[in-house]
Amino acid sequence: MGFFNLSKKQATTQSKPVSNSERTSGFEYLKRQDVYFDGACQSLRPQPVIDSLVEYYQKHNSCGERVKYQWGKVTDQKVEQTRDQVLKLLKLKKRDYFVSFTLNTTYGINLLLSQFDFKAAGIKTVVTSDIEHNSVFLATQSAATRAKLERLVLSREADGSLPISEIPDNSLVVINVMSNIDGRTLKNLRDIITYVHQKQGIIVLDAAQAMAHNYQLLQETEADAICFSAHKMYGASLGVMVVRKTLLENLNLTFLGGGMVDDVEKNSYLLSAEHDDKIHTAFEAGLQAWGEIIALGAAISWLEKLPASAKECLESCETKLFDFLKSQPKIHCLNQEKSTTFSFYVEGIDSHLLAEALSDQNIMVRSGYFCVHYYLDHKMHFPPLIRVSLGYQTTESDINKLITILRKFN
């Protein structure tokens, strides 16, 4: 990294060291010199979430929904509480929706699409957008091919909205609520949901990027399914599926295993999901990540109790970084507005080498195409990018440290 002509001494003397007291409560363990800008991949976990996971392993490690001993009862109660917390956070009614847990967002989307009965649902077209993460882009390719249906890739507007009039009748629409490139959000989300349903369609939302800082966008929406990851919203590693109960009518459940059945005979079985109180088992084959599920409950509680000052600090950091990136002639920033997620490249500098140089200064960013190969590489022909994604652990000192280094390239 010598050609960048940066030393740790230079970087640290030109920006104020981060005091742990500056950070939002829960991140006191983070070393002062460490600057984490990769929350779009996975967020750091606040201490209450870590404590919750440790408590499970140390105080009631047990298999959920299977045992009669006290540890198991504690686990069952806390897991059920987390399911309720997810629905409450999204302001969705338990009579209409259920919550299942899985590996991650990608896994959840694939569980839905791979078991979807397109003929029974009357679906004639699979629709997605150009800025989708590979979790959606590949899953919709596979689903359309399997069902022998047309797949339509619509172009999102600069503000993130989707052209509603271009969505055909009887479509399965799978789209993100917030981009992992530049944080643009689906501005006309509610109108799209209404339109798709009016046209006898079904809509599945990838909410992976939205849940940490923009979950309000999803509150009281009536999508058929919402998939997201706990590890992108300050929880432990876990996938979450929020599914409209009536959607099960259009699924042929073939990914089966323990915990999903009430009875099994030689050549037949009875699914537990046929009972409303066990409907969540439709997507929960085998033992689940009980500790991680409980830790998600702790993450939601932590998010809901965040003081206004934490949100104001994050917004201030977004503004400062956005204003800087857009003011630099040699930095090409993809963002049209501020966000927690920024992507850019510097003229004449390889982004992968820049990411390594920043790492030498204890600044952690992503470089590349961030699993959005089609849009970034093949459609827009961008070079590999740098992605900086902020979180509630971010301080103004973190932003200043990054800016101090990036100024050297202009």
PLM-predicted stretches and their roles:
Residues 1-410:
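Pyridoxal 5′-phosphate
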